[in-house]
Amino acid sequence: MNKIVLAAAVAASVAAFPALAEEDSSVDPLLTIWTRDATDYNAFSKVAERYTKETGIKVKIENQEQSEIKFEKAASRGEGPDIYLWAHDRFGQWANAGLIAPVSPSEEEKAKFFRFSWDALTMQGKTWGYPISVEAISMICNRSIIADKDVPDSLEDFVKLDDELQKKGIHAIEWDYSQPYYSFPVMASQGAYVYKKTATGYDVNDTGVGNQGARTGLKFIVSLIKDKHIVKGTDYGIMQDDFVNGHVACVFDGPWSWSYYEQAKVDFSVNRLPTLNGQRMKAMVGVLGLIINAHSKKKDFAIQFIENYVLTDEGMTEMNDRRSLGAFALKSFQAKSKNDPRVNVTMQNAQDGEPMPSVPQMIKFWSAIQGAITNSTSGRQDVDAALSTAHQRVLN
């Protein structure tokens, strides 16, 4: 889009919101974006450069550690970025707290994206952001250790493979097991669920974190550690180091890791998540979205940047070339990626999985279930006691 067209579009947007026009007249049109990590920072660099070149509006990209915590604190003070990149599961909490602004994309704009991606960002009849991509973990395997045709389809078969590989000093599987995002999919395969899905959203008074399926899944994870199929204390950093150094055959990881493994010269495959007791693991599906700070005085510029620069085939190409985004919310760009098996598998795992509920109560779920997993895998509590406690914490 050239400067004249953008200027006209921005002018129309500002004219539609006189209060914004008045505010923006005294504000330097510098857009600030906060990202989650260095790979997200790199992803935005090219599209931001193009936007500045064509419009004259500068974009400041900041990589913030623990950005979700910093965003909450800054936005609650009326500060922080204009645009923030995060997965949709926290949007309900932030919307409820008045930290993010609802958006009103046109029906024409909405039609460009898969409907479920908008559904994930819609609460209480309002849309709280723009979808970029669909994220789900997959089973990523090192081809120098295990050929594609030999990748087990069940966790039980991974145990058998581990018995063989340990003779060579290699483990069959690892993941950051203390984090619910990676371990709850095992529990969900057996019937655990975060909150009960209803016709209008979620019943936050009905949780399956302590049901029999959750117990079966977590007991299996504990058994993997107890029987030394997974090294006790494995976290995300250890897992990635082991994978790139050839100490483990397969890991649970997401599309954000692909570029890291490519840079490490690992020849890897992306595979469907395995089963447990014949039931497929259910990834916790996130829609990566761009949200606008409720206190931003440059909402009009933010919307123009997002709709006309980021969420286009050109913008998605610029981003995905620098940071693997996984499966795409933009239909036209997903269609262009149909021959990429990694993208297709990610979408398959997303379809097998369950979207993370975007309700304010999710913060209680994350805290409670992480405590249960940590206490169970460390031996501080048995699984039944740990999940009973988690169940009560999620509901109270």
Predicted regions and their residues:
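Extracytoplasmic/periplasmic substrate-recognition and gating elements
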Residues: 49, 53-54, 127, 147, ...
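Hinge/lid segment of periplasmic solute-binding proteins
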Residues: 88-137, 153, 157-160, 167, ...
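Extracytoplasmic "Venus flytrap"/periplasmic binding protein-like
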Residues: 49-115, 122, 128, 143-153, ...
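Periplasmic solute-binding protein
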Residues: 92-99, 116-153, 177-202, 285-292, ...
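Glycine-centered hinge/linker elements that transmit conformational signals in sensory
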Residues: 162-165, 203-233
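Long, aromatic- and glycine/proline-rich binding clefts that accommodate carbohydrate-like moieties
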Residues: 271, 319-368
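Conserved N-terminal structural module of periplasmic/extracytoplasmic solute-binding proteins
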Residues: 4-9, 18-93, 107, 277, ...
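Conserved C-terminal helix/tail region of periplasmic/extracytoplasmic solute-binding proteins
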Residues: 23-26, 349-396
